[in-house]
Each structure stands twice: as C-alpha cells, then as structure tokens.
Amino acid sequence: MKLLKQLFTQNRLWAEQIKAEDPKFFEKLASQQAPEYLWIGCSDSRVPANELLGLLPGDVFVHRNVANLVVHTDFNCLSVIQYAVEVLKVKHIIVCGHYHCGGVIAAMGHKE
C-alpha cells in the first residue's frame, strides 16, 4: 500500500508542476485529441513513446504490446489502428521495435 500511496503522491506533484508551468495544460489536453502519429511499440517499460519522440501527451496515439506485434487476429491492435486512421485521422503509423526485446527473443526461441 505504501508504494501505491507514493504513486499517487508523485502523480499529484507532477500535475502541480505541469499546472504551474502551463495553467491551461489539462484544459487544452481534455478539449481535443488530434495526434499526427500512431505509435505501435513494445510494452517494455524502458521505451515510452512520448519520451522517445520528445512529444507531449496528446501528440501521439499509442498502442503497446509485448514485442510490438501487429497480428491479424489481435482485435485490440486492429481496433486501435482503425480508430487512429478513421476517427483521429493520423497521418503516420510507426511500428517501433527496440534492441534486446524480451518478447521477440521469447518468440524466436520457440520452434513450435
């Protein structure tokens, strides 16, 4: 429970800092979502799309899964792509992998 409290405290402090830097940040963020990019990336906690791209929340629509896979049977991923293209009108789709991906290593290791 202590770690959960710490997360909420960190979130509150982050929100206060953002609000101090830009008092209308959350208002602007809530009013629209018009990203130019759909990022399909790995769930690995070391590769967050916004930070890798240097973009703010709202600038990139993100779908993450283990090993950044796009498979025709993954309806979650397909619905994200459809929503991004048809509703958000993204201009670019980025499928981004990374070195030493545990998901890719696991998938390539099984010969079944």
Predicted ranges, named:
Residues 1-71:
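Short, conserved "active-site rim" segments that organize catalytic pockets and cofactor/ligand binding
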Residues 56-112:
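Short HxH-centered metal-ligating active-site micro-motif
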